[in-house]
């Protein structure tokens, strides 16, 4: 995964959000914008749902534009931008994600769609940081349960990093484990379980 790239999320991830008590109602394989990698946790990214403006009414678009001008947290909920066409970034519907839950790159005109406009990226990142700050003050405030989802993904990452050698199940590791247990017995040390 790369920052500022667009991806499709897996059904497994949508199911995970629901299992954790959150809501994610869009199963249409719309692209999500992979905005930034977490500053503290490697391989954890912050993604933002996107949608096409074509099916929005002029009244809905005007309402979103008005919200964008507000100084309150509502001003960070959405961003109207442009990639290969006008797009709505639903920033308040952001979520953490890992590579495990990406089903593929979002392809447009035969290539992986990547946002390259630095001004757009800056505005989106600022709004994302506002939403994440608000979430830190009010955990699970947003319908997708950002905090709970992040905690779950962090625990998955930690488990992957600390997989005991016994879990790797290869012939080489079986021999290594047997030798380790023999050495521990000779030294009178009880092997860890």
What are the functions of these language-model segments?
Residues 1-29:
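Short N-terminal edge-element motif at the start of the domain
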Residues 3-6, 44, 88:
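A residue-level signal for beta-strand positions that form part of recognition/binding surfaces
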Residues 10, 51, 98:
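Residues at the C-termini of beta-strands that transition into short coil/loop
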Residues 13, 54, 101:
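Residue-level detector of flexible, active-site-proximal loop/helix-junction positions
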Residues 27-29, 38-82:
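Compact nucleic-acid interaction/catalytic patches
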Residues 61-193:
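C-terminal terminal-subdomain/extension
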């Amino acid at each position: 995964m790369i920052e500022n790239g667009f991806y499709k999320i897996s059904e497994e991830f949508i199911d995970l959000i629901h299992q954790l008590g959150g809501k994610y109602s869009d199963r249409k394989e719309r692209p999500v914008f992979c905005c930034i990698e977490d500053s503290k946790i490697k391989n954890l990214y912050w993604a933002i749902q996107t949608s096409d403006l074509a099916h929005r009414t002029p009244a809905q678009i005007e309402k979103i534009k008005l919200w964008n001008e507000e100084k309150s947290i509502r001003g960070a909920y959405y961003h109207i931008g442009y990639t290969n066409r006008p797009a709505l970034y639903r920033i308040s519907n952001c979520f953490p994600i890992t590579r495990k839950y990406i089903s593929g790159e979002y392809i447009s005109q035969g290539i992986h769609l990547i946002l390259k406009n630095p001004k757009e990226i800056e505005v989106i990142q600022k709004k994302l940081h506002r939403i994440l700050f608000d979430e830190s003050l009010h955990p699970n405030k947003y319908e997708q349960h950002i905090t709970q989802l992040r905690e779950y993904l962090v625990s998955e990452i930690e488990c992957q990093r600390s997989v005991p050698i016994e879990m790797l199940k290869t012939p080489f590791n079986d021999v290594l484990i047997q030798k380790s247990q023999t050495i521990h017995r000779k030294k009178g040390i009880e092997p860890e379980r």
